[in-house]
């Protein structure tokens, strides 16, 4: 049978009576309230003050101010103003107010797309396109768009002119329309804009030239000249509903160098005719 050994008495440790009292109180949950509340209150006030200081610092330094986008824009402004496009990264970090690591993030990206090259550890040189005309690119694009709009407008006007020329050709040279190429007195009288005005109708051959000199105070002079045949001038009395040939009150006509050959189609030299109209107020 085994014999039980008597329990060995451990040597007692020398403890400070004050420390033993504090430890006993900490282990006892009932005595937790015995801790000094003043110490807890001081710690809470310190924490609140620390948090408020951190918030104040965040307000003073917006996140956008240190973003890569903002720093890259400022970096490009420095590149644009740098002589030869060479920058000292130490000075760049000082001017931007950031660590050099942030500047290296920018230069590494630009170096990867062959826009800068490293001259030394802390110096880079811009090797991209010329930045002196960087601001003129939007203006150049705007001018190109305006030029495209003007070219499109010019093409549209050319089409309208071509269409009008075709309609004029069909009106004057078409055999079906040739017999209807005239206006009657009733047609002129029905136009409201001609009322209370002097209306002069001119019947002249092709390529007839009409010149209107500067009007005088009391009259207007009109020169009509033709080398292909006679010129007939009619005055339409719109108000009275009558027409008169060559003469009317306040209107004078004179004819010179005008002949009526018996066979104009057999004549070698074309017939010349000139009319001078003078309308008095």
UniProtKB/Swiss-Prot annotation:
Record keywords: Cell cycle, DNA-binding, Isopeptide bond, Nucleus, Repressor, Transcription, Transcription regulation, Ubl conjugation
Region of interest: Leucine-zipper: 143-164
Functional summary from the UniProt entry: Inhibitor of E2F-dependent transcription. Binds DNA cooperatively with DP proteins through the E2 recognition site, 5'-TTTC[CG]CGC-3'. Has a preference for the 5'-TTTCCCGC-3' E2F recognition site. E2F6 lacks the transcriptional activation and pocket protein binding domains. Appears to regulate a subset of E2F-dependent genes whose products are required for entry into the cell cycle but not for normal cell cycle progression. Represses expression of some meiosis-specific genes, including SLC25A31/ANT4.
Any one annotated GO CC term: nucleus
Gene3D superfamilies: 6.10.250.540, Winged helix-like DNA-binding domain superfamily/Winged helix DNA-binding domain (1.10.10.10)
Family: Belongs to the E2F/DP family.
SMART domains: E2F_TDP (SM01372)
Cross-link Glycyl lysine isopeptide (Lys-Gly) (interchain with G-Cter in SUMO2): residue positions: 9
Any Pfam family: E2F_TDP
Gene Ontology terms, MF aspect: DNA-binding transcription factor activity, RNA polymerase II-specific; DNA-binding transcription repressor activity, RNA polymerase II-specific; protein dimerization activity; RNA polymerase II cis-regulatory region sequence-specific DNA binding
Subcellular location, record wording: Nucleus
Major localisation: nucleus
Motif segment (DEF box): 95-129
Region (Dimerization): 130-222
UniProt keyword ATP-binding, yes or no: no
Annotated protein name in UniProt: Transcription factor E2F6
Signal peptide from the UniProt entry: none
Positions of region (Transcription repression): 173-281
Region annotation Disordered: where it falls in the sequence: 241-281
Tissue: Expressed in all tissues examined. Highest levels in placenta, skeletal muscle, heart, ovary, kidney, small intestine and spleen.
Residues of the DNA-binding region: 50-129
Taxon lineage: Eukaryota, Metazoa, Chordata, Craniata, Vertebrata
Subunit record text: Forms heterodimers with DP family members TFDP1 or TFDP2. Component of the DRTF1/E2F transcription factor complex. Part of the E2F6.com-1 complex in G0 phase composed of E2F6, MGA, MAX, TFDP1, CBX3, BAT8, EUHMTASE1, RING1, RNF2, MBLR, L3MBTL2 and YAF2. Component of some MLL1/MLL complex, at least composed of the core components KMT2A/MLL1, ASH2L, HCFC1/HCF1, WDR5 and RBBP5, as well as the facultative components BACC1, CHD8, E2F6, HSP70, INO80C, KANSL1, LAS1L, MAX, MCRS1, MGA, KAT8/MOF, PELP1, PHF20, PRP31, RING2, RUVB1/TIP49A, RUVB2/TIP49B, SENP3, TAF1, TAF4, TAF6, TAF7, TAF9 and TEX10.
GO biological process: negative regulation of transcription by RNA polymerase II; regulation of transcription by RNA polymerase II
Gene: E2F6
């Amino acid at each position: 049978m085994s014999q039980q050994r008597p329990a060995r008495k451990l040597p007692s440790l020398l403890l400070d009576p004050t420390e033993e009292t504090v430890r006993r109180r900490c282990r006892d949950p009932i005595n937790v309230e015995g801790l000094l509340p003043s110490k807890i209150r001081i710690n809470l006030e310190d924490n609140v003050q620390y948090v408020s200081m951190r918030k104040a610092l965040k307000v003073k330094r917006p996140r956008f101010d240190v973003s890569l986008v903002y720093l890259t824009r400022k970096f490009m402004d420095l590149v644009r103003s740098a002589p030869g496009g060479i920058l000292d990264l130490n000075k760049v970090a000082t001017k931007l107010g950031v660590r050099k690591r942030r500047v290296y993030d920018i230069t590494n990206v630009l170096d990867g797309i062959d826009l800068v090259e490293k001259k030394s550890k802390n110096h880079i040189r811009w090797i991209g396109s010329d930045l002196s005309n960087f601001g003129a690119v939007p203006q150049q694009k705007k001018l190109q768009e305006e030029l495209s709009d003007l070219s499109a407008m010019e093409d549209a006007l050319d089409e309208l002119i071509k269409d009008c020329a075709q309609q004029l050709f069909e009106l004057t040279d078409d055999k079906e329309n040739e017999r209807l190429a005239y206006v009657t007195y009733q047609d002129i009288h029905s136009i409201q804009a001609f009322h209370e005005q002097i209306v002069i109708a001119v019947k002249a051959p092709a390529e007839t030239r009409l010149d209107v000199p500067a009007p005088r105070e009391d009259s207007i002079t009109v020169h009509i000249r033709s080398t292909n045949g006679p010129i007939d001038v009619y005055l339409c009395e719109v108000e009275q509903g009558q027409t008169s040939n060559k003469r009317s009150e306040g209107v004078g006509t004179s004819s010179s160098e005008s002949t009526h050959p018996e066979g104009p189609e057999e004549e070698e030299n074309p017939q010349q005719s000139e009319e001078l109209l003078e309308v008095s107020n």
